[in-house]
Structures are given as C-alpha cells and as structure tokens.
Amino acid sequence: MFQIFDKLNKLIVEWLQKPIKEYENRSPFNLRDLESVMQPGDILLVDGNQRVSSAIKYLTQSTWSHAAFYLGKNNKFSEKFGTDAILIESDLIDGVITVPLSKYEKFNTRICRPAGLSDFEKEKVIEYMIDSIGLDYDRKNIIDLMRYLLPQPPVPIRFRRRMLALGSGTPSKVICSTLIAKAFQSISYPILPVIQKEKKLKEVSYRGVKHSQYIEKEYYHIRHYSLFVPRDFDLSPFFSTI
C-alpha cells in the first residue's frame, strides 16, 4: 500500500513541476547584478514558472510563488557549500537544500532584507537555516496544491489565507515560506504580525482638574508560521524591498 501511495505521490510531484506556457521574464537584472546587491540573510522572492507556482499565486493573489534564503558568496560558509552565491530553499522533491543563485537568473525576482537585525541575530537566523538542511518537504502540501489545481476553485479572497495554512505542521517537514518564517521567529523577529488595537477610558488629572480620555494601545500578535506565504515578506514593514 505504501509503495502505491509513494508512486502516486511522485506522479503528482512530476505533474506539479511541469512548466506553464508563456512565462515572461520581465526582470532587467542578471546574475552579476543580484550578487552585487544581495547580502547574507536576504530573502529572494521568485515568480515561478511551474504549475505549482500558479496555484500559490492564485491563492495568495500575488506575483510571488517561492521564497529562498540567501547564504552568501565567498564567505565563511564557502568551505562547506562552495564558492558560488548560495541559497537555502525547500524543494518539492529534495526537501531543504542549497542551490546556486544562478538557478533563478532567468526568473522574475525581488529581494527582501530584514531591517534592524544585529550581527548576532542575523547569525542565529543563518544557523537555523543551515541546521534545517536535509529536512523533508511537507508532502501534505502536495495534496493540498493538487486539490486547488484540479480545477482552480472560485475561492473568496477572505478564505484564501486559511487555505494556504498548508502542510501537516510537523517540525521535521517544511515548505519554503514556513521554513524562513520559523527561522526569523526563532529570534522573535516580526514578519507580518496581527495588530490588535484596544481603547480604554482612563481618568487623568491636569492642574488639579480631573477628566477622562481614551488611551489607545496596540498589541502585536505573532502569526503561526504555517500561515506565512511568500508575499508576506514583500508586504512586511519589517523587511526592506531592495
């Protein structure tokens, strides 16, 4: 039974990875441009060209279907990962792996950079990503995406994020954006928190005269990592678009 399921799983993966027709590269940047700008800790958002990319872009109403973490080039990690510009990403087949930045040279991309991170915090995020190499891709995500492609459902916008809480949530199995979200949440760095505003009536005194006024407070609640999608890094006020 397991062999049948595994074979079916592979067939679905192959189908999801087939390229879509009429993909257009609108990016004016080449590999050298990307390498000159990117810094370790940056996130590369990718407008993918596969069927799986279409499902993610449809559900998120966004250009971006994939997110990868930039490790850098010719730095202290080069001895282990090579001298090329290296990304860490979660792949549909191979799980969490390193790939050269050149993989996405012909794609539409955007660079998102976390703002205000100390060197220590950045190192912690990088360590988390490196320690994640070898984890499996969350295969429940494959079934979810297949469900939305056959055919693409007319889903109201307010329900799409709920549908994108993809995967089983198993710590040893990840998808691209949830892995990166977990890495930044490991240092309590906000990405796109839920903001709760609360007004309270408070009695204050000014020059001996008492009066009441409303005090407004904002509370930032961290989203569960499984709810993050690639476009959230683009929308986040805590990430700069380069």
Where do the PLM segments sit?
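Cysteine-nucleophile amide-bond enzymes
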Residues: 1-242
